[in-house]
């Protein structure tokens, strides 16, 4: 009933859906013999939005909308500088994976297996950014997990199922969406076993975690606790099938190039033997020759390597690549700082020599692209601290001396240039 008589004989109106009176809600909208309140309208809009978003994910993965490998590569180029071979390998692997999902419902004699991906490359070479960009491009749930925090079930640390729990959180616990997501497991090299022989002692954060990851990566029905954390006997679990989740594992694998070099450059003895320094070859070039036996010798178990059939290697970024990373991508660091200063109505100019100094410093620190922001932050700290309270500044100029710590930013006022911090 949409209306009732009040004690003062005036007609009191009620929402036909939730039963709240007109005094309990902000607005009551009338229809033919029915009323609906603003709260119910908001709830309906939310339901429609969620269903539209779910339909959007399905539509985005349909064959007609699934970008081709070349289109995936072109989009990766907008965000990631260099690493051309790795981008091509990833584009093909991701395209084939979601093309396979599109045809799951079709009955066929040939069953297509999942091809998970292993990314090998130094810190700051773009492994995580590549995975993040792929997930954003495909509009699928995405989560980053740190392998170093994982332990075997029953020990202090995170169970491997917690990775899937985080994936569920990222898509509001919609199981169907989570089952088509992407999981990036970082620092996979840090859980290598201590020797290439099977362990006879318990290694709960190394080989034990690799064993725990096996079924998850290959495809299993994972029992996920809804609120995360450890499992409890009286707890209800969410069942998630990981068969169609794409797993991308990444790691720096420091020392792997030595393992590969020892295998490929077995020199002879005598006057005819070729004497060649192992340092002559670029590390990225060496890593491209990675074979499963090298990864086993490094400390990954053969079973896990077999479940990561697509291997993409990334090389170290040189000075020219780091300078491009600073200015060329859509969300390049220099563009971000230009925007920050523009909010203060100040123009920021970072001169080419300063960009070169930033790149050189990142190479010295061996942090790759990941260390670029901290270098610029350090150089701009004083001027960003003082700028909001300064009057009349129209432009800030950064040269190489500022980056090297030998000078201060040049501030351009209406007519007279001044140095930051000078009176």
Curated annotation (Swiss-Prot):
Q: What Gene3D superfamilies does the record point to?
A: 1.10.8.60, ClpX chaperone, C4-type zinc finger domain, P-loop containing nucleotide triphosphate hydrolases
GO molecular function terms attached to this record? ATP binding; ATP hydrolysis activity; ATP-dependent protein folding chaperone; protein dimerization activity; unfolded protein binding; zinc ion binding
Q: Which InterPro entries match?
A: AAA+_ATPase (IPR003593), ATP-dep_Clp_protease_ClpX (IPR050052), ATPase_AAA_core (IPR003959), Clp_ATPase_C (IPR019489), Clp_protease_ATP-bd_su_ClpX (IPR004487), ClpX_bact (IPR046425), P-loop_NTPase (IPR027417), Znf_CppX_C4 (IPR010603)
Q: Where does Zn(2+) bind?
A: 15, 18, 37, 40
Q: Which CDD domains match?
A: RecA-like_ClpX
Name the coiled-coil region(s): none
Q: Which residues bind ATP?
A: 122-129
SUPFAM superfamilies linked: Glucocorticoid receptor-like (DNA-binding domain), P-loop containing nucleoside triphosphate hydrolases
Q: Which UniProt keywords apply?
A: ATP-binding, Chaperone, Metal-binding, Nucleotide-binding, Zinc
Q: Where is the ClpX-type ZB domain?
A: 3-56
List GO BP terms, alphabetically.
Answer: cell division; proteolysis involved in protein catabolic process
Q: What's any one GO cellular component for it?
A: HslUV protease complex
Function summary: ATP-dependent specificity component of the Clp protease. It directs the protease to specific substrates. Can perform chaperone functions in the absence of ClpP.
Its subunit composition reads: Component of the ClpX-ClpP complex. Forms a hexameric ring that, in the presence of ATP, binds to fourteen ClpP subunits assembled into a disk-like structure with a central cavity, resembling the structure of eukaryotic proteasomes.
What protein family does this chain belong to?
Answer: Belongs to the ClpX chaperone family.
What this protein is called in its record is ATP-dependent Clp protease ATP-binding subunit ClpX
């Amino acid at each position: 009933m949409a209306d009732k008589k009040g004690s003062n004989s005036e007609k009191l109106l009620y929402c036909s859906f939730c039963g709240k009176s007109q005094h309990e809600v902000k607005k009551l909208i009338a229809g033919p013999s029915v009323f609906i309140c603003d709260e119910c309208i908001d709830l309906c809009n939310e339901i429609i939005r969620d269903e539209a978003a779910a339909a959007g994910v399905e539509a985005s993965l349909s064959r007609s909308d699934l970008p081709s490998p070349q289109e995936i590569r072109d989009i990766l180029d907008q965000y990631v500088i260099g690493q051309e071979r790795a981008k091509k390998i990833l584009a093909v692997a991701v395209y084939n994976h979601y093309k396979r999902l599109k045809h799951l419902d079709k009955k066929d004699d040939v069953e297509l297996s999942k091809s998970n991906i292993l990314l090998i490359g130094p810190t700051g070479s773009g492994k995580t950014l590549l995975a993040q960009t792929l997930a954003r491009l495909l509009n699928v749930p995405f989560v980053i997990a740190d392998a170093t925090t994982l332990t075997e079930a029953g020990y202090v640390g995170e169970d491997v199922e917690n990775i899937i729990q985080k994936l569920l959180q990222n898509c509001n616990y919609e199981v169907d969406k989570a089952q088509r997501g992407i999981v990036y497991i970082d620092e996979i090299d840090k859980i290598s076993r201590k020797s290439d022989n099977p362990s006879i002692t318990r290694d709960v954060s190394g080989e034990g975690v690799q064993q725990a990851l096996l079924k998850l990566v290959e495809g299993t029905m994972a029992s996920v606790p809804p609120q995360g954390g450890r499992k409890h006997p009286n707890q209800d679990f969410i069942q998630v099938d990981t068969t169609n989740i794409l797993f991308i594992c990444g790691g720096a694998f420091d020392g792997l190039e030595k393992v590969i070099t020892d295998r490929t450059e077995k020199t002879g003895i005598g006057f005819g033997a070729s004497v060649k320094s192992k340092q002559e070859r670029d590390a990225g070039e060496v890593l491209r020759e990675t074979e499963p036996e090298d990864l086993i010798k490094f400390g990954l178990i053969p079973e896990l390597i077999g479940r990561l059939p697509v291997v993409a290697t990334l090389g170290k970024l040189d000075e020219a690549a780091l300078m491009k990373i600073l200015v060329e991508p859509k969300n390049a660091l220099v563009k971000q700082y230009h925007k920050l200063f523009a909010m203060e109505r100040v123009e920021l100019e970072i001169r080419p020599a300063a960009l070169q100094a930033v790149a050189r410093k990142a190479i010295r620190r061996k942090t790759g692209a990941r260390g670029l922001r901290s270098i610029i932050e350090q150089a701009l700290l004083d001027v960003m601290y003082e700028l909001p309270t300064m009057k009349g500044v129209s432009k800030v100029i950064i040269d190489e001396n500022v980056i090297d710590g030998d000078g201060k930013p040049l501030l351009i006022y209406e007519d007279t240039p001044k140095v930051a911090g000078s009176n």
